A protein has these predicted regions:
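C-terminal accessory extensions appended to soluble enzyme cores
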Residues: 128-160
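Conserved AdoMet/S-adenosylmethionine-binding subsite of the radical SAM
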Residues: 1-122
Length: 160
């Protein structure tokens, strides 16, 4: 289907990059132009476990998602080595009744890492519980993406 429908973009999110090679089509090569694959890493442990595997895979369009972002995550070593191969990094807080905290400082730190290596960055949503400075905000579901957009925390790639 993905090979046939080149008029569509396919977007997949995984937390199991080690299973990527299972069921790949024979003509995958370096990936199809219309397939985007994202790997999640919610904390430093998972980033260090998943990203070395994910970033070595033959995928044309790769993105990293810190979602839900549950702590500070340093991905500089991955951005330094693979930055030109990463389409973007996305961060967002956790949703749900028992959502864990997302801290503005963690989001800003990740954005700064991306800026340093010229990798696009997008802050998708605050999550249900968002900390900025000493204040913790409990944000209704309908406002989580709106509040993230109002924060204007993003970085675009420099033109080639």
């Amino acid at each position: 289907m993905m090979r046939i429908r080149t008029d569509l973009d396919f977007f997949f999110v995984t937390k199991r990059p080690e299973r990527f090679h299972i069921s790949l089509p024979e003509d995958w090569g370096e990936g199809y132009k219309n397939v985007h694959i994202c790997c999640t890493s919610e904390n430093q442990y998972m980033a260090d476990k998943r990203l070395p595997v994910f970033l070595e895979l033959p995928i044309r369009h790769k993105s990293i998602i810190h979602g839900p972002m549950l702590g500070p995550i340093n991905i500089e070593r991955y951005l330094e080595k693979y930055g030109k191969e990463i389409d973007q990094v996305v961060c967002g807080g956790e949703s749900g009744d028992e959502a864990r905290l997302c801290d503005y400082a963690w989001v800003m730190d990740t954005m700064c890492q991306c800026v340093k290596y010229e990798v696009p960055f997008h802050f998708k949503q605050t999550g249900a519980n968002f900390k900025r400075g000493d204040q913790i905000y409990h944000i209704p579901r309908k406002d989580r993406q709106i509040q993230a957009a109002k924060a204007k925390i993003f970085a675009e790639a420099k033109p080639a």
